Regions:
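Conserved glycine-rich beta-strand-loop-beta hairpin in the small C-terminal domain of fold type I
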Residues: 33, 279-293, 300-321
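N-terminal small-domain helix-loop-helix segment of the aminotransferase-like
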Residues: 7-99
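Short catalytic/ligand-binding loop motif for oxyanion handling, primarily in non-cytosolic enzymes
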Residues: 40-45, 165-168, 197-198, 224-227, ...
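PLP-dependent enzyme catalytic core of the Aspartate aminotransferase-like
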Residues: 70, 82, 171, 328-333, ...
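Conserved core segment of the aminotransferase class I/II
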Residues: 52, 75, 79, 214-283
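Walker B catalytic acidic pair
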Residues: 193
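Conserved core of the PLP fold type I
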Residues: 59-182, 196-212, 216, 359
């Protein structure tokens, strides 16, 4: 059978997860799966949220509209862009996607650019998707060092803040100035910040940057309200040509995103019951994350060359232990060589771990 080879490799994170599960099964011992990329402190309680959903309704049981259920897109605008007038035009700025990764892949597919700039420390899937879509890519060291005057409308810059894998958070003023500077130059900015609302839910940053042209926002709900199994995200963009092509690709790639998932997430972000549920979920999750990060600091496991005097924000942290060392101590982790394109040998002595687990369990292994 003749096939088209993507030249991308299978996800290391998935492979490590399989290795950890196999070891736990074979040894009968408990392993701490910090290789994962999901919140695992507590589950969000949907008991009161789903009470208002009619599982026998037509809306629940049939295909959703191509761009997403209209009331859900209205709720997204209300949650992320509260100063924006909700009308036919603004509703077309929001397209519902089955999670964050498909959103990013669609963006990479659609943009006709000569080069995509990723951060030095980056989620490995960025480059894998670019490879599959045959997009050239390179890297920048930090937001502050991006040389805007050397870029033009043939460049796309990905910004992940707080960063995955490091958890480094750039100040909002620096972010805002750089996004404005880049977009005014015609550079396309893809803002991928799925962990922000876990910690900063009531801020207006998304609302503020939404005024810029040449900006695309990709979002994954699972990083701040849980429910990764529902596969729910969205793309925000004001460019009509981009949205027209996105509408076509959404149709032929997905033919609508799960109606039940949209209805559940809509109620989580828009109803009193849902807001109470995700507020509790976020509070408990953040409390445990902060305790875990403090433990890493106390044990001097956070590399100063990455963090200096700062602490990571988000569900990930980098520590001064290798993937193999941690595995020998029954901890699943992902070597930092999977999150850089250069100097892989050097960074292989460090690992990214997920710190979004119960503190008692985390403390037991460290």
């Amino acid at each position: 059978m003749k096939i088209n080879i993507s030249n991308a490799t299978f996800s290391s994170i998935v492979g490590i997860g399989q290795k950890v599960k196999k070891a736990a099964k074979e040894t009968g011992q408990e392993y701490l799966e910090l290789n994962r990329g999901v919140n695992a402190v507590v589950e969000i309680d949907l008991t009161k949220v789903v009470d208002g959903i009619n599982f026998n309704s037509k809306e629940f049981q049939v295909y959703a509209p191509n761009l997403g259920i209209e009331s859900f897109r209205e709720s997204i605008i209300g949650e992320y862009f509260p100063s924006m007038k909700i009308d036919e035009e603004s509703l077309n700025f929001v397209s519902v996607t089955p999670g964050g990764m498909p959103a990013l892949d669609l963006v990479i597919q659609i943009l006709n650019v000569e080069n995509v700039l990723f951060p030095k420390f980056y989620w490995g899937s960025y480059s894998k998707m670019a490879t599959i879509r045959k997009r050239s890519f390179s890297f920048y060291d930090s937001i502050e060092t991006i040389e805007t005057d050397k870029l033009n409308d043939s460049t796309c810059v990905f910004i992940c803040d707080p960063n995955n894998p490091t958890g480094i958070k750039v100040s909002d003023s620096v972010l805002l100035n750089k996004i404005e500077e880049l977009t005014k130059k015609g550079v396309i900015v893809v803002f991928d910040s799925p962990y922000r609302k876990l910690f900063l839910n009531d801020d207006r940053f998304f609302d503020t940057i939404s005024k810029f042209d040449n900006l695309i926002i990709t979002e994954s709900f699972s990083k701040w309200i849980g429910l990764s199994g529902l596969r729910m995200g969205f793309i925000f963009c004001k460019n009509k040509d981009f949205n027209s092509e996105l509408n076509i690709r959404l149709l032929y790639e997905f033919n609508g995103v799960s109606s039940p998932s949209q209805m559940i997430v809509e109620r989580v972000i828009s109803t009193p019951e849902g807001k109470e549920a995700h507020t509790h979920f976020r509070r408990i999750t953040v409390e445990n994350i902060q305790k875990n990060i403090q433990l890493l600091k106390d044990y001097q496991l956070l590399p100063e060359e990455i963090y200096g005097k700062k602490l990571p924000i988000g569900i990930f942290a980098v520590i001064k232990k290798s993937e193999d060392f941690l595995f020998q101590n029954r901890i699943g982790a992902v070597g930092m060589d999977k999150f850089v394109y250069h100097d892989k040998d050097y960074w292989s002595s460090y690992s990214r771990i997920c710190v979004s687990v119960k503190h008692e369990l985390f403390n037991k292994f460290f």
